Amino acid sequence: MPVRILVVDDDRAVRESLRRSLSFNGYSVELAQDGREALDLIASDRPDAVVLDVMMPRLDGLEVCRQLRSTGDDLPILVLTARDSVSERVAGLDAGADDYLPKPFALEELLARMRALLRRTTPDDGAGESAAMTFSDLSLDPVTREVTRGDRPISLTRTEFSLLEMLIANPRRVLTRSRILEEVWGFDFPTSGNALEVYVGYLRRKTEAEGEPRLIHTVRGVGYVLRETPP
């Protein structure tokens, strides 16, 4: 059975363009023109993932995310944000979106991000044998998907979890931007912009929320490294 994607956007041209592209690439596509219609469709005929615009009438994309997450629903969500609105991107992640894509975007990038998001959603057959990974007082369990810093639990989206998992699996090893983008997002497009920087900043905010020392460091011009002290 094809993977079912719900596309939610109040712009008819955007909806139809995404429907054609996703259908051409083997997905089954449903359309909604606002957040209220989207929630009704999700309740009646649940899709496998959602592409969700932020700015919409009646009920915006952020509120859709919040309502789904407040009920414990972990439906994979990719939000579409205004190109230059960093606050909108952060708000999307705060609301519980798994990933974001600024408009205008290349269709190839949206398809790559959707593949990566669905891949992160699919359980790994060998995951049951994985042991929890630790670095300093940071712990990540690939099976239960629980993350803690000391005794403090940390809630992460799928993308944040995948990024932290890559870092903690390569302690004290500098990882290049291109390698991280390829492994976590499945691509390294020039249009990716500052997606990686946004997610690193978000992980830092969550792992340092109670004043803990920084573990995720920038290696200027190269990438990032997980270590106790700055490089």
UniProtKB/Swiss-Prot annotation:
Domain of life of the organism encoding this protein: Bacteria
Annotated localization: Cytoplasm
Post-translational modification: Phosphorylated and dephosphorylated by MprB.
GO CC terms in record: cytosol; protein-DNA complex
Keywords, alphabetical: Cytoplasm, DNA-binding, Phosphoprotein, Stress response, Transcription, Transcription regulation, Two-component regulatory system, Virulence
An MF annotation (GO) of this entry: transcription cis-regulatory region binding
Alphabetical list of SUPFAM superfamilies matching this protein: CheY-like
Domain Response regulatory stretches: 4-118
CDD domains in the record: REC_OmpR_PrrA-like, trans_reg_C
Modified residues (4-aspartylphosphate): D48
DNA-binding region: 130-228
SMART domains, alphabetized: REC, Trans_reg_C
Pfam families for this protein: Response_reg (PF00072), Trans_reg_C (PF00486)
A GO BP annotation: regulation of DNA-templated transcription
UniProt function note: Member of the two-component regulatory system MprB/MprA which contributes to maintaining a balance among several systems involved in stress resistance and is required for establishment and maintenance of persistent infection in the host. Functions as a transcriptional regulator that recognizes a 19-bp nucleotide motif comprizing two loosely conserved 8-bp direct DNA-binding motif repeats separated by a 3-bp spacer region.
The protein's name in its UniProt record: Response regulator MprA
Organism: Mycolicibacterium vanbaalenii (strain DSM 7251 / JCM 13017 / BCRC 16820 / KCTC 9966 / NRRL B-24157 / PYR-1)
